[in-house]
């Protein structure tokens, strides 16, 4: 898989707002039929300050492995599928770093997400929100 849905006018869309993905032409079909989980140990976000940017490593509290909710494309013959990461409003404890965060699927909801048993709204309600973070280099 390759990261980023290809935009018709060029460029890549690496993130999709979970609140509107099912309505957007670029993501609609994938939101219904092609869901994926992207494994990670954390994700990184940069806080903008007057004196520059500060990089943070962020993950659910007490977890060493997390799965980001994603969507993927049906590839053309000979091409690799492409994926995008779903995002949501940032959890309260990290919103000072950035106003958005990836949708992190709880372990017990992973099968439901992959089998289309969860709607995007249900996934948002179940998504991990108790986050821990530290400055990263």
Regions found by a protein language model. Give the residues of each.
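Short linear sequence motif anchored by a di-proline
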Residues: 1-137
């Amino acid at each position: 898989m390759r990261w980023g849905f290809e935009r018709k006018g060029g460029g890549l869309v690496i993130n999709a707002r979970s609140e509107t993905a099912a309505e957007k032409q670029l993501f609609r079909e994938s939101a219904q039929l092609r869901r994926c989980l992207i494994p990670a140990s954390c994700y990184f976000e940069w806080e903008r300050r007057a004196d520059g940017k500060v990089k943070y490593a962020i993950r659910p509290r007490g977890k060493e492995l997390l799965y980001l909710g994603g969507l993927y494309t049906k590839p053309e013959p000979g091409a690799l599928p492409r994926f995008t990461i779903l995002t949501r409003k940032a959890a309260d404890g990290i919103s000072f770093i950035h106003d958005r965060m990836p949708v992190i699927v709880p372990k017990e909801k992973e099968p439901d997400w992959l089998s289309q048993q969860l709607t995007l709204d249900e996934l948002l309600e179940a998504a991990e929100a108790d986050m821990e973070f530290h400055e990263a280099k």
